[in-house]
Amino acid sequence: KEKIPVLLMLQGNVIKENLVFVNRNEEWLKHILKVHGLEEKNIEILYLDSQDQIQFYTKNNLKRDFV
């Protein structure tokens, strides 16, 4: 069964209920951002895709993906 993408951040704001939905927490998300040198305020959209990988766009419209 394929999973649907789940939005985790929008315009620098964490969507806490969606983190709970995917069995993650804010500490996990902050660690992911720190490891990749990202700041919450620079994230336009960040989501967990159907393959359980993080995909995001920054305010500069840079698309990146990582596990």
Short names for language-model regions:
Residues 1-67:
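Terminal domain-initiation and capping elements
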